[in-house]
Every structure is written in structure tokens, then in C-alpha cells.
Amino acid sequence: LIMLAAVLGYAFVDGYTKFLLLAAVQGACFGLATTAGITVAIDITTSARRSAGNMVYAWAARLGMLVGVVLGIGMYRMYGFRMVTYLSVAAGLASIFFASRVYVAFRAPIGVSLCNMDRFLLPRAWVPAINMLLIAFVPGALLPLMFVGDYWSLAALAVLVFITVSFMKMFVKLSHHCQRGTANTTCHLSMEAGLLVGMTVACHLMDKAQIYHVASVAAMLAVFFFVLLTYPYYKKKQVR
């Protein structure tokens, strides 16, 4: 509800600072909701099917992001930013309704410290996390170009969806039995960080040729990083 209130606030905000504050609130709430969703997806599946549950959740999340971007751009061009905001809030309310229909048996936490990061970062997956960040940087850098009529970023996002699912399997196989949710969250965070860094760099450069140059360099670095570092590391460290 806090995230939806922040999204609704976009329609009435009147300053850049206020916009950033709302975005920070939305991002924090989205991160918590994503982590909770991953945990629920694992808890409601049997032990033998939890890896498959991870994959289904990953596909749903990536496809939702891709469809959301396309619909958002279309609605913005036809009806303006305020209508996009209202559509986002409606989608959020629908997600709350569907989440409320899921029954999860209560399990009291055991030995939980006051502050820990075990639900967010998987140390064993730091190498593929960096690789995922480099890959996501490419569509992130190309996304702002859609506002000048260049839609190659949609193709890059589609490629990112398929690559991320394969990477998700890698993250899960690097995790131990009780760390599948953490593996999923780490993959999400590294991908989202790459998109954010890419968009930030593109907005800073403000030049189409330079943006394509930087995106091309990042794509080549991602390929070499995977071949030389990520894949050998994965083959050495995988546990299943």
C-alpha cells in the first residue's frame, strides 16, 4: 500500500526532489515485495519442485516487466503520464488481491538476528551477479532512446528476459538447499542495478551515438566476462 501511495504521488508531485523521494520509497517497497514474493513462491511448492517454482516466478517477473514497459510507453503517448500512474496503481491493487488469495502456513522464524542480509545477497554468486549487471546495463542504456523514437531497447529487453532465466538457473545451482530464495533475489537485484546504472549513464551522456558506443562496449565486456570468468566459476562452484 505504501508503494502504491508513492506511485500515485507521481501524478501530483511538483518538484524533482519530491519525485526522487517518491521513487526511493517505491524502490524500497518494491525490493521488499519482490523478496517476499520469492519467499512465498518457494514456501508454497514442494521441496522437489522448488527450483521449478523459482523458474516460474522468474519468468513471470521478467515478462511482467517487459509488458509493463510496452504498455507504459503506449499509454504515455496516448493518454499522458497521469494515466500511466493510474494504470500502475490499478495493477498494484490487482496484485494485492491475488496475493491475498495465496495461503501460506505460518512458520515461526528460528534464530533470526536483528539485521542480516541473507535474504538479499548470495556471496557465492558474486561473479554471475557482476555479469548480470553488465548484461542488464545494455537495455538500461538503450531505454531512454525510446523517447526519441528508437525502439531497439525493446529487443534488448526481450533478450534480457531469456538470458535472465538462464542466469537464474545458474544462481540457484550455486546456492545451497536453504538459499534458493536468496539466489533469486540476488539475480533480481543485480539485473535491476544494471538497468538503473544503464539509464543513469544514458541520461548523463545525452548523445545517441555515445550511448550506442557505451552499450556495445558493455555487451562485449559481458560476453568476455561470461566466457572467461562466470562460466568457469559456475562449473567449479555449483552444488547441484
Please place each PLM-identified region on the residue numbering.
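C-terminal transmembrane helical hairpin of 12-TM major facilitator-type secondary transporters
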Residues: 150-167
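C-terminal ends and interior cores of transmembrane alpha-helices
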Residues: 2-14
